[in-house]
């Protein structure tokens, strides 16, 4: 609905696209998608599973995106910001490549003892062969910190919700039984942001106030 008045295809950048789950899904839905990741192996997997053959996969650095200013309608950073040392630079780059009124979508983890217990220790226990230091608590981001990063980058947070796994679903029980996270594992909105949160921000036109 946000882009309903435009006849041009909505151009989406998926930052830290990994194996392409989101990029490939969005391409199937008719969006014009670019996926960026630092891992050549992940990009190869993503391209192999792209049913449309239309996603443009690029190996690159999220801290210095290889794209022109104001070239995307949407930028996604889903489960990515908590893996980088300088998330503020990633957010700033998202703001740079977004067109005015473009949207920045995010999902990440809060930084507190409960998030450490659930996201780090819980995942290590539930999911076998979890890579060492897959998540590091000091890299987790408090909601107020992410709001500040957005404001400094010309982005206004429009919505921010807590996020929690869908407990009791078939995918949840499959994970418990196999200790492998299935592809259909899902999160839902939650009242609390203590563990994880998701939302989106809008790129303000030049000269607009962020208050």
Regions found by a protein language model. Name each.
Residues 104-128:
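Conserved class I S-adenosyl-L-methionine
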Residues 126, 148, 152, 157-211:
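A C-terminal cap/extension of S-adenosyl-L-methionine-dependent methyltransferases
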Residues 13, 19-64:
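Class I SAM-dependent methyltransferase SAM/SAH-binding core
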Residues 88-100:
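A short glycine-rich, Lys/Arg-flanked "PGG" loop and its adjoining helix->strand segment in the class I
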Residues 1-9:
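Conserved alpha-helix/loop element of class I SAM-dependent methyltransferases that forms part
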Residues 80:
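Hydrophobic adenine-recognition pocket in adenosine-nucleotide-binding enzymes
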Residues 76:
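A conserved beta-strand element that flanks and buttresses the S-adenosyl-L-methionine
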């Amino acid at each position: 609905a946000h882009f309903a008045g435009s006849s041009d295809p909505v151009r989406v950048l998926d930052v830290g696209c990994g194996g392409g789950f989101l990029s490939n899904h969005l391409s199937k839905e008719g969006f014009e998608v670019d996926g960026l990741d630092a891992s050549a192996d992940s990009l190869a997997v993503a391209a192999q599973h792209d049913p449309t053959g239309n996603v443009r996969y690029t190996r690159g650095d999220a801290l210095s995106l290889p794209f022109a200013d104001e070239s995307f309608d949407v930028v996604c950073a889903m489960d990515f910001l908590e893996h980088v040392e300088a998330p503020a630079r990633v957010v700033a780059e998202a703001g740079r490549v977004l067109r005015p009124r473009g949207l920045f979508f995010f999902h990440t983890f809060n930084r507190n003892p409960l998030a450490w217990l659930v996201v780090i220790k819980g995942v290590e226990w539930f999911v076998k062969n979890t890579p060492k230091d897959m998540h590091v608590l000091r890299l987790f981001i408090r909601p107020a910190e992410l709001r500040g990063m957005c404001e400094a980058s010309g982005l206004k947070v429009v919505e921010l919700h807590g996020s929690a796994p869908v407990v009791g679903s078939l995918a949840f029980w499959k994970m418990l039984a196999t200790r492998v996270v299935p592809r259909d594992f899902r999160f839902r909105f939650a009242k609390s942001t203590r563990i994880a949160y998701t939302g989106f921000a809008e790129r303000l036109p030049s000269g607009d106030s962020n208050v």
